[in-house]
């Protein structure tokens, strides 16, 4: 705890000494404008969790319990207006290795906006992610306890196979983002075509198309899939959106959860009920076809040759999310529910369960520069569950500078989805976060 307090002091005094109250800078030349914006988040996390073995106890390579985390983004939006048409480009730089910022920093892309709507070319974030509403919209802090927790450690495994868990609603913001829990390191998400209608009487809609979610910005080659044997059912050596699992007797399962011809859409409605009351509703969905089949193969222990034993069809992606946020005076509350059904699963491997869903809710109260919130999250992935409660508070020192503190308690219960005979195991823990967000 002393180390956590020391880290908090460093964050606070460094932020106060460096931050200045500024407005977002604009560079304007007649009909051409450049808008510069960005943010920096620094966070220290302390965790206490049961049933961790050996190096599972390490938050970082060489430290237990305490770790630091950062998120950084810088964006420049260049626009040119001719008559009633606005054309421009948004260029986003993320110095850290993982793309983990919010949808408002939705990556570099070209856009064209008219009175009929807005088209985004090459955006890595789809329409459903940008229009989706969750309970976390009203919370203080970051809700990032899952960055420090380890839910699939050695104690939770069976025959060396890990259980699958979801730890935040962010999974549903990118349910086909080329990975199983988060975007792969040093890669961006696949490029998309987005269209958004203008807001009309509180309503706004959007739709996106993604030809291939394996076509990420970080791939060296256009053909991301390097096959060790030819044919559509060949074993892929790719790392993007694919994992290979050892089951028994030298047998493996290769699961490719990339999607082709993916469509996503969303509809939001905002309404000012009175001078002090506002309501926002959202309904979003995603649909797509699996790029490849689940592959059951055997690896020769001597020659390492791969023999394909069988292939199985994965279910289509079918996902939806419902969300609402209500604000009255200083009080806010939000709730959301998301469901992926049996998306991208096959009964030959997902023997324990195939359905995935989540729900969450949050309440918040703000008075002057102080905001406090309480949030609850429940997820179920293949019958493996996570429950988490988070209490957070933040204090606005000046516009753009926001220190925060947060404490979360979580519980995960489950087993590897391939082994229905495995016992369900439980791990619990508490995470404390102290950090500062600087936005300009």
Swiss-Prot record:
One of its GO terms (cellular component) is membrane. It holds the Pfam family Porin_4. Keywords: Signal. One of its GO terms (molecular function) is porin activity. The keyword Hydrolase does not apply. It comes from the Bacteria. Residues 1-19 form the signal peptide. Gene3D superfamilies: Porin (2.40.160.10). This is Uncharacterized protein RT0064. It comes from Rickettsia typhi (strain ATCC VR-144 / Wilmington).
